[in-house]
Amino acid sequence: MKHISYARDKFIPTNEVNLNVIDNFLSIVRGYQVFTFLKTVNKGKPVFLDYHLDRVLGNAKSMNMIVRQSKEEIKSLVQDTLNQNRFDEIECNIMILLAGTSPIDSSALITDMPVDLFIIITPAKLYSSKSYERGISLGLFEYERPDGELKTPFTYFGGLKAQHAVVREANYDEALY
């Protein structure tokens, strides 16, 4: 099943969502982006959407990002994006990404441009029926983000490390970090 996402003011197939190094220089090279990640339940209903929007918009504000859309507009766009998808077989993951665009100074650190909004839809992980019978194994990985309130790609290093150390190398089903 192909999913539809929202990228830069239009709906497109998820596999066509991309960031251009020049257009999104601050996001790709400088890490000037924030995101939140949530799931759907009960045939496409987002879980804790208001909480996630408050968090991602609060993170954007703390990074002095210019966000063109209001919370209510983003909430509506999330629902519009979900409406582009089918939920008769599988639930989905939703990533709301605010990605920095082009710098305006020679240091390539400052911009007065609004961030690009992405609402990326991917399939949720499916567990086998045996997983529901026997349970799943959860491996622990100790990691403390430098800033516990701010969720950016560079603060997500612990998650990447946990997946490799706990899930891949220690053969757990999931990692808690």
Predicted feature residues:
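Short, internal active-site loops enriched in acidic
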Residues: 99-104
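Helix-start/capping segments and mature chain N-termini
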Residues: 1-68, 72-80, 106-177
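A short glycine-rich, hydrophobically flanked beta-strand micro-motif that places a catalytic Asp/Glu
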Residues: 92-98, 175-177
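Short secondary-structure capping/junction motifs at helix and strand boundaries
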Residues: 68, 83-95, 128
